[in-house]
Amino acid sequence: MKLFEYQAKEAFREKGLPTPKGVLVRGMDELDGAFAEVGFPCVLKSQVLSGGRGKAGLIKVVKDAESAKATAKTLFESEHNVRMLLVEEAVDIDREIYLSITVDPVESKIMLIGCAEGGVEIEKLAATDPDKIVTVRVDIAEGLGGYHVNNLTYGMGLSGDLGKQVGAVVRGLYKTFRAYDAQLAEINPLFITKDGKAIAGDGKLIIDDNSVWRQPSYPLTRDYFDSEVEFEAAQEGIPYLQFNGDIALMCAGAGLTTTVFDLINDAGGHPATYVEFGGANYTKAVRTMELCLKTPSKVILVVTFGTIARADVMAQGLVEAIKAHQPKQPIVTCIRGTNEEEAFAILRDAGLEPLTNTEEAVQRAVDIAAGRA
């Protein structure tokens, strides 16, 4: 679960990390109060979960109320579905530093990551100039020690008062990481002001989905989703993604769904949805189709391969979904696996042709969407 920047910074402040003064606004009518509290110049930061906000023009520095309101209006009306802005004081910056904490899955340890250059895309820097990145691994049972922090800051070339300040930030970031069951806690950039103070300029916090139940402060809300249907799917525990294509894809299992998604694109088609009803969701065909039908499409492609999830149960669920929602689009099916012969009979009785070759099913769906079948 990825948190918004304002939420990450709230978590940082709870653990003693310094952040710029900021006020969250959800509409134009809240701007005057925010400007009165924060002052000018200030920064308008769009609260969206996608990365690259600066490059996308979603973070703007403003110097007065008139320009700030015009800029805020543009951001709220942008194609990026901005529903919240963080109005934050502008910081007099001398330099920027990168800090993050994540998990090393190979060594099963917590990994501290630092770079003396902040505001960077760390993945690109790792590929082009890896020597600039310093990593220190921490045994979770042992916990963070002073030598871990010193190894990181010294490795970044930081010493004296600056090294101590950055070290204190590392300790606070580690506390945040552990307290929130995080997969990633990141400050990029960490501002070093001209008077020598360290301030978290940006914040990213991703909570492990398996531990969200331990974090009641962050319930699943509409704010985290671009569309109402994605929110509904998340509430049901059904993985759902929406695209601009015309082939509604219903599959069982993440691996199969991803494979079929790629096959559709390879065949010249364009998915409208990516929906999984495998695993624990394999009896949710009725609800899955209901979600699919909320996105316009020309054809519905159903591909499953059941092992523990029985093919006949999925086929029966699909037939019930068709009876319940009576979709107008043609339906292409390829349901294989445990009890597949029974599944084929169920589909034939419902007037559906059970295909047994995934590539054939994909091609037929693509042809239907293109008007060739």
From Swiss-Prot:
ATP binds at residues 35-97. Its cofactor is Mg(2+). It is an enzyme of class 6 (ligase). The keyword Calcium does not apply. Its EC number is 6.2.1.-. Binds 1 Mg(2+) ion per subunit. Optimum pH is 7.5. Mg(2+) binds at E186, N188. Residues 9-249 form the ATP-grasp domain. This is ADP-forming sulfoacetate-CoA ligase subunit SauC. It comes from Bilophila wadsworthia (strain 3_1_6).
